């Protein structure tokens, strides 16, 4: 499916943690619904303004009932600084969904015990993945590592079997997995989006 380019409207642009924002927008194109692991490009500045490229941001959550998409992003440069300035009712350019994402039906047909592992802002697309896995009948175990305090973890508790998160320089996601390892886990297929 080809990506759509629409003008999206901001509902909220909340500070979640230092330099971390949760942007909620209305996505008017229901024919181009995103799924886990896909991303959009976001642009809140003119075509003749810097930076030259739009910012690719993964889908944190898609809510088809309200036609809203949430983007969890880190403010690290000029483009994301401009996105962080967006306020309620602001309009901006949103193009997507793009990328292959995760093939949830294939994953749940092959694996009955699944661990979702991530770190820092790389956990952003894992919420939609966890939701889709749970909706397909497999509640995964979630293991995340963060440089500083964990964020957005409460929302996982309702849809995951087990949720473990750690922080600090000595707690990468793999180490958290070893400490909180659930019985029955073994190495399996990994995915990237």
Regions found by a protein language model. Give the residues of each.
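FNR/FR-type flavoprotein reductase catalytic core
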Residues: 78-193
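Ferredoxin-reductase
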Residues: 1-88
């Amino acid at each position: 499916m080809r990506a759509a380019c629409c003008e999206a409207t901001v509902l909220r642009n909340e500070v979640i943690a230092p330099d971390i924002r949760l942007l909620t927008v209305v996505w008017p194109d229901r024919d181009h619904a995103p799924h886990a692991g896909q991303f959009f490009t976001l642009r809140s500045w003119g075509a003749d303004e810097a930076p030259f490229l739009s910012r690719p941001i993964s889908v944190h959550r898609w809510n088809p009932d309200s036609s809203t998409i949430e983007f969890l992003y880190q403010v690290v440069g000029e483009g994301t600084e401009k996105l962080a300035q967006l306020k309620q009712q602001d309009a901006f350019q949103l193009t997507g969904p793009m990328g292959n994402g995760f093939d949830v039906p294939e994953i749940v047909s092959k694996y009955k015990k699944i661990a979702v592992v991530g770190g820092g802002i790389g956990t952003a697309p894992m919420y939609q993945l966890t939701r889709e896995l749970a909706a397909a009948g497999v509640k995964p175990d979630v293991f995340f590592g963060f440089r500083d305090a964990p964020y957005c973890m409460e929302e996982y508790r309702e849809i995951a079997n087990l949720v473990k998160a750690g922080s600090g320089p000595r707690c990468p996601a793999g180490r958290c997995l070893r400490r909180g390892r659930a019985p029955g886990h073994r190495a399996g297929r990994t995915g990237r989006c």
